Amino acid sequence: MKKIAMGLLIFILSVPSLASSGVGIVKDEDFRAVGVSQENIDKVKTIITEASTQYKLKTLDKKALEIEINKYILDGTEKNLDKLNELVEKVGIVDAEIIKDRLKYQIEVQKYISTDQYLKARELSLEKLTKTQQKQ
């Protein structure tokens, strides 16, 4: 069950942008078909948008730290070792914050759409995609 929940979280957070009428490949109608209210779907979309924004910001912070690390490496690793160690610690903190955020947003999403509902809705979407591809 933990693997399914983590898979759900990774899928949801890896979606760079929301579809206009769904979450990733799963459409609103598929969520409604498995018993999720439109209000809950809208709340999940809001959570995912916030999660995506936070992830992008923290990723930018991490990249900025990595650029600074590279600058100090080019300037001389040995003489900048203390500063490099400090920056590496900061990168670790940002990585930990990203993981904590994923867990936080997963908990928030599961308040509105259960793992079972998501998996059933996803299966409906995949069936529709398969039928559409077979027609072409």
Where do the PLM segments sit?
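Myb-family helix-turn-helix DNA-binding modules
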Residues: I25-V26
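Amphipathic alpha-helical segments
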Residues: E29-Y112
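Short, low-complexity, Pro/Ser/Thr/Gly-rich segments in the mature regions of secreted, periplasmic
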Residues: L119-Q136
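Long amphipathic alpha-helical coiled-coil segments
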Residues: I107-E123
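Sec-dependent N-terminal signal peptides
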Residues: I4-P16
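Boundary of Sec targeting at the N-terminus
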Residues: S20-S21
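Residue-level detector of intrinsically disordered/flexible regions characterized by low predicted structural confidence
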Residues: I4-A5, I47, Q133
